[in-house]
Every structure is written in C-alpha cells, then in structure tokens.
Amino acid sequence: MTVSAALQQSADEAGLLPSHQARLDYRTGKGWSTAGVANGFVQGNLAIIPERYAGAFHRFCQLNPKPCPIIGMSDPGNPHIPALGADLDIRTDVPRYRVWRDGEMVEEPTDLLAHWRDDLVTFVLGCSFSFEEALMADGLPIRHIEQGCRVPMYRTNIACTPSGQFAGPMVVSMRPFKPAQAIRAVQITTRFPAVHGAPVHLGLPEQIGIADINTPDYGDPVPVGTDEIPVFWACGVTPQAVIAAAKLPFAITHAPGLMLITDLRNKDLAVL
Amino acid sequence: MTVSAALQQSADEAGLLPSHQARLDYRTGKGWSTAGVANGFVQGNLAIIPERYAGAFHRFCQLNPKPCPIIGMSDPGNPHIPALGADLDIRTDVPRYRVWRDGEMVEEPTDLLAHWRDDLVTFVLGCSFSFEEALMADGLPIRHIEQGCRVPMYRTNIACTPSGQFAGPMVVSMRPFKPAQAIRAVQITTRFPAVHGAPVHLGLPEQIGIADINTPDYGDPVPVGTDEIPVFWACGVTPQAVIAAAKLPFAITHAPGLMLITDLRNKDLAVL
C-alpha cells in the first residue's frame, strides 16, 4: 500500500476528510510530498509575509491574478484560516517550509513553531495541481506526470504589474499538447480562474522571451513532439521569485512540491 | 448613406426588426451582399434537400455538429421556418441561390419560385459571421475583414463522419492571431456552439493536411505574421462541398456571402 493509500484508509477510518487527515499527519511528522495526497482537494502555494509588507503583496496578487490567485488569507498573527480547513494550523500543517531573510533562503523547517510572529499574514495561492486533475479527468495527457518529473517552468518577458517592492517577470509552466488537445485545455482551465485559469500563451515560445524550450529556469525539461505545441500557464513560482527578489527582512514559503492541503474541493473552484 | 445604413433606417421607420426588413428588401429585389446587414442578427448557411435525402443529411449534420450546426429546419415542402423569423419565406428572402443538379451548379436565381417543390426540406446552418461579431466586440482583429477580402478556407485531412451518400473532408476557415489573442478567441467562440464553436485546430497547419497556408482552397489568402499562429474553425462550406460531392439529382444552397438573415440575435446563441 502506498503512503497515499494508507493515509486515505486511515482518514476513512477516522471519519475525517482526507485533506484534514493529511494535515494531521504532516503536523505529527508523518508523510512528505503532497503529490497524489488527498486527491480531489485543493493544494495551495504558501506565502507568509510580515504585516508591514502584506498590504503591498496583497495588492500585487490582486493586480496579477493569473500567477497569484488568492484562495485564502489570514488575519495578522492568526495561524488559522477556517475557510480553508477545519482545525488548519498554518504553523504545522505543511510538510516543509522555507524561511527567507533578506532574499536568501536560510532554513527549511518542518514546522514554524520557532519562527511564528504576531505580525505574520498568510496568503494561500492556487496551484496547478487543481487544473491538472481536471485535464487528466478529461483524458488529456500531462507530459511531466507521464515522465515522472517536475513541470518545466520559465521566466518570461511578461512583466507583472508591480506593487511596492514586489515586482518581476511572470514565471510560466509549460505542458505540450497536440493542437486539438491544446484547445480543449484552454476550455477546461478557463473554468478554473482560482488556479491560474486559461493559458497565457501557446506556441511561439520566443515571443515571451523563452530562448530554449529545453532549458527551463525551474523544474525539469520535457520533450515536445513535432506534432505538439507548448502551452504556457501563469505559475505559482512567480510570487515566490518576486518575494525573493524583494529581499524582505523575513518571509516564509512552502518548500517546492510540499504544499498546503486544504478542505476545498477542486471541483468547487470551477466557475462553470 | 450606405445600402446597409439605408436598410437600417427604413427598418426603424417601419417598426420592423432590421432582419425582417432586410428579408423584405431581398424579397422585392433590393440589396445584395448580406455582409454588414442587420448587425447583431444571426445569418445562416442554407441547404435545401429533397425529402428522400433529407434524413441522411440531417444525420450528417447531427454527426458533424462543428461544421454543420443546425439552427433551424423546415417541414417537407414548407417554405416557412417561423422559429427563425416572422414572415420568413425561404423561397424569396435570400439574395441569391445556387441550384445544383447531379453535383453541378446549374443556375443562380434570385428566388426559388420556379424551383420550389413539395418535397424540399430546408436546413439553416450557423455561420461564422456570428462569432466574428463576438470576437470583434472583444477587440480581436479579424484579418480578412481588415484586408477587405473573403476568409481563407482549406480542405483538411479531417474526415467528417459519413451518413448515407454524404461524406467528405471537413473544410476549415483560418484567422491568424497572436497567441494570447488565440487563447481569447478559443474562449469566446466556445460560447457559440451553434455557430461552429471553438476552433478545431491551431498552429501546425500541416497536421490537418494544409500544405500551404498561402493557397486556400476557397476564399482569399491573408498574411500570417511571424508573431501569429493560424487558428482554424470548422466551416459552413463543408456541407456545401459534401452536398456537391453527393451528386444529388437536385439541391439548393445560398450563393457564397449571400446568406439567410434570421430574427435570432447573435447574443442569444451564447451558451454562457
């Protein structure tokens, strides 16, 4: 039995949502990657910012909703976000965090109990896992999942709209599709504006400043067939890169691939 | 004052819908091309088939809804289709018709009074004029309209699903767009399944059997910029080509660009 299946089974036995059970497991040090855990439930990117900078970051997200779709946020100093999960404690419920000081990642703790401050504001941003589930449910193949690697991501020449010290290029993720599949993927992801929504670009990677599709700036390269076109979505790495570039004295994010699992269901994010 | 503006003015004076007034004008021999006439109202492709073949053609349309979206049809021998227009008479209300015998176009009359038969069934199929209006309303440029020519159309290697003697390749129309515009065009036209709906292909024309984008099989070539990709929609020329290839003893279509103007509004065809 896989870890994922075991978590699911224990959740069923306890009568808890699989998402809630997963958070309890991470809280007590069990489990690791959130890939494939609590399928059907929304996973989120995490950004925890001191209140002094939170207003400008909040505006940055509002101004750049495709890379930074807010699905939940906390009051200052409050580690709970009831709208995203019963009993959710942002200090303990993510498998691994990254602590940033002056733009440098200085630590990767498994909880924030030693780092928590009364001025911290938590932002939870939508993640492509949700729309990938919808694409796969429609029968569309996701290349990096087939290949067992990370999605390729690229810095583009598309400038985000700046807010205060938060500024920088949009980072995009890429999934190759045959043309008819690409059209279907536009339709499906359009239904999910809370998790990056429709693609921002397709074909012609050089038009958005991608010189070599085989050399992603983040993640792993995947092959693009001669009968396929690359399709690009705004990516949740954008806010992480922007936070690092802003060189805040202090900030926290999740570690890549180790997300916050919420009690929201992916299907409930569909606008139609 | 243009003919179109004059028609609009006289319609307003008579208290008729502009679409109804346009049909009355065509009925009495006034006016010509339907391009730009009764803006906002649905124009349709026309196929008039003897009842003996109408069942198979109806199934062909049902099996191939993207090139052949039915927006109205008549009872056998009945020249009226009340759902498409008060007072509509299919024998007189289209500016020009094409009469086909054994797959050959033999006449282009301006009415069907001498050709009408009690066994004729009329099919009215959606037309790209409706979705082009929606694209332009969103600010997307339509190249062939900018260039003042006909949309380029191509026979593809996409086989329609056959029904009886009706069979053949899908014909597509092409409009070039920048990638972000192409994504928007997918979204907008998805809202209009009754007028061909979303594109069937984009980029990589050779994948659907188009050897030279600059040599359309119908219509006129238009330039495709190096920063653009060609976007392909199923086209209402498909059923006309299929009807000709079926070599029916007798059939009638509209003459290209001289459509049936209905009282339906384009906006009412939007499914969302």
UniProtKB/Swiss-Prot annotation, chains A, B:
GO MF annotation: an example: lyase activity
UniProt xrefs under InterPro entries: D-Glu_cyclase, Putative_hydro-lyase, UPF0317
Keywords per UniProt: Lyase
EC number: 4.2.1.-
SUPFAM superfamilies per record: PSTPO5379-like
Matching Gene3D superfamilies: PSTPO5379-like, PSTPO5379-like domain
Cysteine disulfide links: none
Family: Belongs to the D-glutamate cyclase family.
Protein name, entry field: Putative hydro-lyase BRADO2538
